[in-house]
């Protein structure tokens, strides 16, 4: 028994030492401003994370990785030695010095983008298991109301079908005065859309499909060269001048030769923000005042996969004659991917729309093993009690 216990302790010690936590901040060389959505990739493992709005990142460096690849579409790629180093202050040089040129196609833009979508979907391996870190943060009347996160395995049989297993999770509602007042006045429970559908939505490129099919959007394509030398095309979309309902502006970036989609970004167009209307949700009507969505795909050693997606949405909720400011953050970070995985028994799959019913459903500090994208400094200060 002692030998077994000793072996177990030794194994645990080796597992902890097998990766080291490195942290850093990345800024623009010329402006000294932080750069968001920079990808940090292990040079052998291919594991990745991204920087937050403050340019900060943290990365559990696997033992086989000796370097970090620092990569952003608008900046020159860097490789940094990670040996015996725990913190980084990185300056990146912009690679976008010239204006992007308009691309004249031999086909329609809709056909061009549909080709990029089809090519990207065909590149995804079939029968996947994605080990992910999922997080959502809910604000009520501009005050933090609820926080949830989880280690979730997404099992994809195809780009149209998946199931999930929630391995461990946390759901915490804050007890500040704003939360107490809201609870005393309302029985409405706010939550993000079904978290089980997050991966399918991204693999289907549903937002882009909607945009290119909507006649209220002006579409054009430009060409640029990424910081690593890859030639890229950029789909630009904005509401047309007389748009009545269209509200989003953004880009979709894909390879000019391989047609693989690298990045999708969308924001509310300031010029057409008045087009926002109240829309019926599950249990209330909602009108957006802020919308920011970013999805990043990673092509590493010929393997193409979803790497990260995030949403920040704020607005006003209406229930009868009661109006409430509601919004928050949703993030999904893919940690590892297995191909041709065995599908678990059906009874192990989670079927609820959100994590709230699970409460505090964990035995380990699972969030520490992921390359979790740091929250803003203000949000982290408010969440300190949760991580104890």
Model-predicted regions and their roles:
Residues 93-218, 226-231, 283-388:
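Surface-exposed, low-complexity/disordered segments
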Residues 1-25, 40, 99, 388:
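Bacterial Sec-dependent N-terminal signal peptides
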Residues 111, 205-256, 260-266:
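Extended beta-strand-rich segments in extracellular/periplasmic secretory proteins, especially
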Residues 32, 58-65:
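Short Pro-Gly-centered beta-turn/loop motif in secreted/extracellular proteins
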Residues 70-80:
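A short, solvent-exposed loop/turn motif at the edges and junctions
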Residues 45-56:
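Short, acidic Ser/Thr/Gly-rich low-complexity loop/linker segments typical of extracellular
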Residues 21-35:
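Structural motif
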Residues 54-61, 87:
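Short, surface-exposed beta-strand/beta-hairpin micro-motifs centered on an aromatic residue
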């Amino acid at each position: 028994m002692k030998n077994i216990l000793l072996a177990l302790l030794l194994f645990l010690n080796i597992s902890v030492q097998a990766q080291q936590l490195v942290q850093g901040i990345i800024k623009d060389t010329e402006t000294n401003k932080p750069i968001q959505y920079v990808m940090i990739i292990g040079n052998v493992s291919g594991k990745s994370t991204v920087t937050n709005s403050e340019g900060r990142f943290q990365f559990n460096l696997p033992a086989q990785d000796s370097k970090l690849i620092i990569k952003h579409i608008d900046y020159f790629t860097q490789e940094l030695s990670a040996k015996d180093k725990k913190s980084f202050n990185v300056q990146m040089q912009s690679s976008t010095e010239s204006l992007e040129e308009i691309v004249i196609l031999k086909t329609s833009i809709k056909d061009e983008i549909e080709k990029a979508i089809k090519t990207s979907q065909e590149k995804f391996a079939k029968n996947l298991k994605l080990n992910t870190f999922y997080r959502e943060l809910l604000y009520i009347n501009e005050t933090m109301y609820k926080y949830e996160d989880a280690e979730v395995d997404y099992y994809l049989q195809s780009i149209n079908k998946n199931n999930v297993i929630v391995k461990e999770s946390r759901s915490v509602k804050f007890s500040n005065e704003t939360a107490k007042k809201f609870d005393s006045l309302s029985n409405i429970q706010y939550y993000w859309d079904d978290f089980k559908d997050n991966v399918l939505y991204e693999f289907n490129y549903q937002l882009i499909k909607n945009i290119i099919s909507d006649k209220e959007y002006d579409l054009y394509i430009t060409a640029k060269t990424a910081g690593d030398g890859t030639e890229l095309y950029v789909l630009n979309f904005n509401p047309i001048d007389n748009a009545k309902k269209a509200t989003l502006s953004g880009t979709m970036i894909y390879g000019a030769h391989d047609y693989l989609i690298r990045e999708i970004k969308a924001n509310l167009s300031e010029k057409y923000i008045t087009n926002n209307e109240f829309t019926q949700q599950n249990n209330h009507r909602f009108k957006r005042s802020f919308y920011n969505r970013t999805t990043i795909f990673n092509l590493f050693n010929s393997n193409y996969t979803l790497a990260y997606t995030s949403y920040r949405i704020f607005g006003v909720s209406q229930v009868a004659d009661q109006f409430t400011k509601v919004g928050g953050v949703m993030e999904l970070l893919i940690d590892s991917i297995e191909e041709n995985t065995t599908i678990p028994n059906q009874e192990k799959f989670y079927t609820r729309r959100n994590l709230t019913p699970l409460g505090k459903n964990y035995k380990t500090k699972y969030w520490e093993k992921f390359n979790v994208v740091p929250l803003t400094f203000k949000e982290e200060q408010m969440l300190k009690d949760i991580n104890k």
